């Protein structure tokens, strides 16, 4: 479909295009003639950090309300020029993009949450969790509004090294698994299930 990419670490399909994160850029690839090869390659946004090539923007996923969310790992500092001004994210965090107007919000700036996020998932009610390659799972929804006061998000469940997270909602899987999360646990070389329960205003 597309060649000549430079260490792409994130990809998602939507609106008739493929969004790709590579190095400092967010690309939009489009196949105009339906031959399975991208005819157009457009840089939507640039200025994402590349201080560590395996922690650049990654893990693209659509939210239930049509926003594109993706992560940025430790050792990365981004200053992205958008039509709405500069969007900055210092160190590890999560981005929320509205593709229609290119509004980009940086969330969890400067270690408010996971130290190396690799994956965001939403449950049936739109609640979001983020997987951390350096520590565990965090409840992300409280950080959905960019904050000036930095508070660290609490962890959910056991610490681990996670890469990728998804909420189970497939009819071909057992009923008792529906609504649970699956995570890739690279430190233990396995895929794990995570069942969460309410804990005050958050989850455990």
Residue ranges and their predicted role:
Residues 1-204:
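Beta-propeller blade termini and top-face loops
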């Amino acid at each position: 479909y597309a060649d000549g990419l430079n260490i792409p670490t994130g990809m998602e399909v939507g609106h008739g295009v493929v969004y790709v994160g590579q190095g400092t850029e967010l690309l939009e690839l489009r196949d105009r003639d339906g031959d399975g090869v991208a005819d157009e390659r457009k840089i939507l946004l640039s200025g994402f950090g590349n201080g560590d090539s395996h922690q650049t923007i990654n893990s693209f996923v659509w939210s239930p309300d049509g926003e594109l969310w993706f992560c940025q790992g430790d050792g990365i500092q981004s200053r992205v020029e958008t039509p709405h001004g500069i969007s900055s994210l210092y160190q590890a965090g999560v981005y929320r993009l509205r593709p229609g107007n290119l509004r980009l919000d940086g969330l969890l700036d400067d270690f408010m949450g996971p130290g190396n996020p690799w994956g965001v998932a939403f449950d049936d009610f739109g609640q979001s969790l983020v997987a951390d390659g350096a520590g565990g799972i965090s409840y992300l929804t409280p950080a959905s509004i960019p904050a000036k006061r930095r508070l660290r998000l609490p962890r959910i469940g056991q610490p681990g090294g996670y890469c990728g997270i998804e909420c189970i909602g497939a009819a071909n899987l057992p009923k008792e698994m529906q609504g649970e999360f699956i995570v890739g646990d690279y430190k233990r070389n396995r895929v794990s299930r995570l069942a969460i329960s309410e804990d005050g205003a958050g989850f455990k």
